[in-house]
Amino acid sequence: MGLGAFMLLGIISLVASVSTTRTELANTSDQIENGRYALQVFNEDVALGGFFGKYHPGIGAVTYTSPSPCETTAANLGFNSTLTPVQMPLAVNAFPYDSASSAPGLTIPSCFSAEVRDKSEILVVRHVDPNSVAVTAANIPTGNTTPYLQISGCDLDSLSFRMSTDRADLTLRENGCTGALSTLAEAWPYTVNAYFISP
């Protein structure tokens, strides 16, 4: 009887230990999967950096700017096709953060709600969504706040591209751009994502 009780106690102890180990392994597996997914999303976003739809300015035909990642006004996002050469934002850029400095580019952007680890880098990625939309009221409603990049396919348009949140501004045309063949060019929603280390 004493031997049976001793064996039963050993089996109960073994089952409890296996159950605890299994729970810890499941938690560790969840953390690994979360990390893997975060890296996948980050890699996909960085790979899209600089994708501005069908637009390619050509070699040496563009001036690059670095607007604030907090900028929300379409006119200040770094796109300007009225200049020669045209102006576009940097696709991917990094800048340091140093809490002891007040120099431009070394301070935390005003729109960041999370804390940024001191003396670390902030990576900003800019691109348009890979899926374009037709310029219609259903896709870009009145009062829209998302900036859209529209690229002209028509040699008769005075601008090669236009950035706006207002559907009425998106008037550039596709290839067959005269007479009955004239159709509005599609537009791409614009995205700016910032990555940083949080303490």
Task: Give a label for each model feature.
Residues 38-199:
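N-terminal pilin/flagellin-like segments and related low-complexity appendage regions
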